[in-house]
Amino acid sequence: MDASGAATMAVLSSLLVFLALSSSLCSAGTLNARPAFPVQSGEIQPSGQNSKQAARRVMHPSFANAGRTPGLEIWRIENFEPVIYPKTNYGKFYTGDSFIVLNTIENKKDKKLSWDVHFWLGLETSTDEAGAAAILTVQLDDLLNGGPVQHREVQDHESQLFLSYFKNGIRYEQGGVGTGFKHVETNAQGETRLFQVKGKRNVRVRQVNLSVSSMNTGDCFILDAGSDIYVYVGSQAKRVEKLKAISAANQIRDQDHNGRARVQIVDDFSTDADKQHFFDVLGSGSADQVPDESTADEDSAFERTDAAAVSLYKVSDASGKLKVDIIGQKPLTQAMLDTRECFILDTGSGIFVWVGKGATQKEKTDAMAKAQEFLRTKKYPAWTQIHRIVEGSESAPFKQYFDTWRDAGMSHSRLIRSALGIGSDELLNDDEIDSVVTQLKKSGGRAFGFMPDHGQNVIETITQYVAKPGSDEIVVSTVPFDEKLPLLGFASYVLTYNYEANNGDTGSLTYVWHGVKASAAARKRAFEEGLVGSKDGLLVQTNQGHEPRHFYKIFKGKLLTSFTALPVTAQLFRIRGTVESDVHASEVAADSSSLASSDAFVLHSGKSHKIYIWNGLGASAFEKQAAVDRFSDYWDDVELEQVEEGAEPDEFWEELNGEGQYDRSLGDDGAPLLESRLFHCHLSSGGFLKVEEVAQYEQEDLDSDDIMLLDAGDEIYLWVGYGVSEEENGKLLDTAKLYFNLEPTARSFDTVSIIRVPQGKEPRVFKRMFPNWDDNYWQNQPSYEDMKQLVIDANNEV
C-alpha cells in the first residue's frame, strides 16, 4: 500500500466510531418540506476565514464545483476517493460499490439553492468503501455549509426521493471496484443476462437467475443477449409497466452497448415462433411455463404498521450523562418539543431525530447514536429508516404525528393557494394569510381548500335515504330545498350541483351527506346511488359536523342540520360562519358540556316558547348577528332573548341539565394544516393496504392505470385513472378506510371529506395542488404502440 493509501486507512481507523454511527442512518425518503438554504444560484458562501470551522474544513478536489447549479451529480468511491461518475451511466449502480449522489434544487422565485445528498451502499460494498462514502458525504455537506439534508441509501431499500431522480429506473449490476467481480464490458458478447423490472413510477431493474423460474406473468423482463436485447412483457403487466420496461431496455442498449444493440419486444401480439425464440435464448422454458403473477406484492411499496404505538422520547445530557426518557405517546402536541433539547420520535415503522436549535453540541452529536441504540433495543431491521430533522425544517411526514402544529409563517403553499385562490406567481403575505386561515379553520367549514366555485348556483336535486325503524329497508324520497327544512341526522342524502368557476371551469358535483345517526344501510345505499349517478363528475362523501366549506356555500348560508324532524325536547345549535353565504347551524347535544366560549349558540327551549341566543366570549360579532338573523323567525310564536356568557339566567341552565364544565378556551387550533402529499395505494393479494408516497410529486406521477390518493388534510382526493376497473372503482371507500386505519394523525374516516376525481375531470382546486398542470398532458404521452414503433425505428438504424 502506498503512502496515500496508508494515510487514508489511518483516517478511516480514527473515524471508526463515526462510521459506526453513520452506517445506521437510514434514508429519510419523504422529507419534501424544508426551507431552502439562503445561497444565491451559483454561489457558495464560505464561513469566515478566521473561524475554527473554516480552519478544519477539508474539500476534496472532485467536489470543487459541487452544488453550484441545479441538477444531479454522482461520484463513485474508488480506492476511498470520490470519482466523478459519467452522466451516461446515471441510474446504473454496482452491487460492490458505494456512491454519493447530490441533487441541487433551485427555488424558481428567489433562486435560492437547496440540496439533498445521499450516500448509496451496494449490498457487496466493502466496509472501508462504505466508511469512505459516509466521511466524504460529511465533507460535501460541510462544503455546502451544512445546508443539505443527508440520506443513507441501501440497495433494495432506497428512499422514494432517491428513486425519483432516475426516470428510467435504477439498475443493479454485479461488480465493483473493491470486489472480485468485474464490471460488464461494453457490448460484451456471449454473456446473457436476465433482468426483472419492478415498479411503475420509480423502477428497480434487478439481475435475476437466467431461468424461466425467475419470471412471472405480472412483471416485465429484459434479456440482454449482447447484440439483441429482448423485452418480455408479462401477460398481466399494465401499460405503464410496459413503457417503463422499454425505457429501461433502451437505457441498457445505450449504456452497455453504445446504442449498437437491437431491442426486441415479445408480448401477446408476438408470434409463437418469436415467443419460443426468446426462451431458446434464455436457455429454458416456454411461454406456458412462466409462473403466475407473484403474490409477494413487492412492487416498490411500503406498508405502514402500528401507528398507535407512536412515542416521543427526550435525549438529554443535563445530568452530565446522556439518557433517553419517554415523555409522551399519542396524542402528541408540538408543545412537547423543547428548542433546547433533542428528541426521538418512534413511529413504529421508522425513527425521526428532532434537533432543537438550542440543543447542546453533545446532544446534537449523540442523538443519532441513541437512535441507533434504540433500533437495537427495539430489534428493528438494520435498514430501518432514520430521519434527522432540524427545528424549523420539519417535514409533512414528521408533523403528521402531532395533533396540532403551527409553523412560523406559511410553508403550505399548495394548500393555501388552492384555498384562497392565489395564483402560483403571486407572493404570499404570511401575516395576512395566517389571519385568514385561522378564521377559516374555525368557522368557515372543513376542507376549505375544496372550492370548485363560490356556490352561486342552485342545488339541482336532494334525495333522502332513511331506514325504516327496526329494518334495513330504505325509504328513498326527493325533498325540496327549503331554508326551514333541516338535513336530518338519522338520514343520508345525495345532492347534485353543477359548478361554474370564474375561469370557465365547469362540471357536475355530487355530494353524499351522512347524518351522525344514519344507519349503515342508508349510508351504503346513498353512496352506491351517488357513485352511479355521478358518472364522470366529482363525488364527495362527507359527514355531519365535518362538511367542506363549499357544501355550506351551496346552501347560501341557510344550512341547518338537526338530530330530529320535530323537536320534542330542548335543542341546541352551534352557529358558525365567516360570511353570509357560509353560515351554518349544527345541532349538538342539549347539555351544558356542548357549549364553547369561542362560539355562538342558539337554544330552543323545550319548556317555553323562547329562544336563547348565547354569545360566547370568543364568538365573532358576525356570528352573534348571524344567530339572530337565522333564528329570529325560524319558529313561529317564540320570544328571542340574547344571553352573554357569564350572565345566564337559571332557566337557561335548567334546559341544559344544569350548569357544568365546558370548553372555555378562546382559540380553536383544529387539525394541523399539512402540506398535501400524494400516495399510490393498492390492496395486496393478502388484503393488506400498500402505501407508497410519491416524493416531490408532479402531474406525471398520476398513473392512469391506478387510483392515486392525494391527502390534503381535511379532504382526501381519490384520483381515478382511465384504466381503473369498475370493481376497483366500487371499492373507493374501502381504500380510504384502510388508509385511515394505517395513517398516524388524529383524523378518521368520519372526520374528513372523501372526494373522487375522475381522470380528465380534475377541478381547478385539484390542479392547483400540483407545481404545474397541463390539460393536454395525457393526450401528448406516447402510447405503448407508439413506443414499439420507436423501437423498430431505432433498430433500423443499428
From Swiss-Prot:
Phosphotyrosine modification, residue list: 90, 612, 662
CDD domains, alphabetized: gelsolin_S1_like, gelsolin_S2_like, gelsolin_S3_like, gelsolin_S6_like
Binding-site residues, Ca(2+) 2: 705-706, 728
A GO MF term: phosphatidylinositol-4,5-bisphosphate binding
Binding-site residues, Ca(2+) 1: 599, 623
Record keywords, A-Z: Actin-binding, Calcium, Cytoplasm, Cytoskeleton, Metal-binding, Phosphoprotein, Repeat, Secreted, Signal
Region (Actin-actin interfilament contact point): 128-131
Primary role: Calcium-regulated, actin-modulating protein that binds to the plus (or barbed) ends of actin monomers or filaments, preventing monomer exchange (end-blocking or capping). It can promote the assembly of monomers into filaments (nucleation) as well as sever filaments already formed.
Family: Belongs to the villin/gelsolin family.
Protein name: Gelsolin
Species of provenance: Drosophila melanogaster (Fruit fly)
